[in-house]
């Protein structure tokens, strides 16, 4: 029986694709200059993850083992193309901001990794849930990284939200503080490396604290059985 709680725990925290597996670092570090871009890429990746996991799970019994990887890549490429066309049609500004990193979702190791490790071995519903949790975990890391860099770099939050949600979302932009000159280190990839390292360190500290709080298993004393033989 599938343990959905364990799948959620693995995707969101224990085996988070961004903080633990360190997959998808290229777009993660390059696109997360703002929260809007981070959410856009995260949602696109999550949609592809869910769709690819479902399709791989459905065709797993019909694809020969020898050619499964090329077939999985073709499925992922088709889904990425569909998502790319949707973003191009309904969020053109975001499409321009994400640039080459949108089609490069095809090569993201998170997606092919989950297709091979989980979707090809489980039913469609479990595979879809795994894709949702892994995608959500990746999106959360992108969002935290993007929000931190945007606040430090230009003193705003949700800048350009209208590119993702439409003209009404301009009201969501928050001016955290007034910045005369942007903090370039936070806006450029070196700053992303630093913030990402701090997030990984924070997760390791939290994991260590949680492990220390767990009660140690009581040591059961060994019992030696005495054999009694009847003496006549």
Curated annotation (Swiss-Prot):
A cellular-component GO term for this protein: plasma membrane
Spans through the membrane: 18-38, 39-59, 69-89, 93-113, 127-147, 182-202
Function: Part of a membrane-bound complex that couples electron transfer with translocation of ions across the membrane.
Cellular localisation: Cell inner membrane
Name of the protein in its database record: Ion-translocating oxidoreductase complex subunit E
Presence of the UniProt keyword Membrane in the record: yes
Principal cellular location given in the protein's record: membrane
Gene: rnfE
A Pfam match: Rnf-Nqr
Record membrane topology: Multi-pass membrane protein
Alphabetical GO biological process terms: electron transport chain
EC number: 7.-.-.-
Family of the protein in this entry: Belongs to the NqrDE/RnfAE family.
The entry's keywords: Cell inner membrane, Cell membrane, Electron transport, Membrane, Translocase, Transmembrane, Transmembrane helix, Transport
Subunit organization: The complex is composed of six subunits: RnfA, RnfB, RnfC, RnfD, RnfE and RnfG.
